[in-house]
Amino acid sequence: MHVKKGDKVVVISGKDKGKQGVILAAFPKNDRVLVEGINLVKKHSKPTQANPQGGISEQEAPIHVSNVMPLDPKTGEVTRVGYKVEDGKKVRVAKKSGQVLDK
């Protein structure tokens, strides 16, 4: 996958197109990511001991990884991801600026 947990991304298609967020979790087996504040769904919960009120809460649902693109740390624009080997390690590189995306 071209994005990882903690990456700042922009949604490039779907109902939340143009919105930015940080990846909270990645699910490589399903090719999906959970992005902060994106694809909010209403979750209905029954009253329980922990939450006696119950009710409706909003939470993020995963979206397909092809619908997000990482932000270039140098320019702040969306960018494609390339890969380079630096010091024997494979690192992700922003195609627009050549900046390393991995911390």
From Swiss-Prot:
Keyword presence, RNA-binding: yes
One of the GO biological process terms: translation
- Mention one GO molecular function: rRNA binding
Cellular component terms, GO, for this chain's entry? ribonucleoprotein complex; ribosome
Region annotation (Disordered) maps to: 44-73
A Pfam family matched by this chain, by name? Answer: ribosomal_L24
Q: Which UniProt keywords apply?
A: Ribonucleoprotein, Ribosomal protein, RNA-binding, rRNA-binding
- Biased region (Polar residues) positions are 47-56
State the function annotated in the UniProt record: One of two assembly initiator proteins, it binds directly to the 5'-end of the 23S rRNA, where it nucleates assembly of the 50S subunit. One of the proteins that surrounds the polypeptide exit tunnel on the outside of the subunit.
PANTHER family in the cross-refs: MITOCHONDRIAL RIBOSOMAL PROTEIN L24 (PTHR12903)
Q: Which HAMAP family does the entry mention?
A: Ribosomal_uL24_B
Please give the family membership noted in the entry: Belongs to the universal ribosomal protein uL24 family.
How this chain assembles, per its entry, is: Part of the 50S ribosomal subunit.
This protein is called what?
Large ribosomal subunit protein uL24
Q: Which organism's genome codes for this protein?
A: Bacillus pumilus (strain SAFR-032)
Quick one: which gene encodes this? Answer: rplX
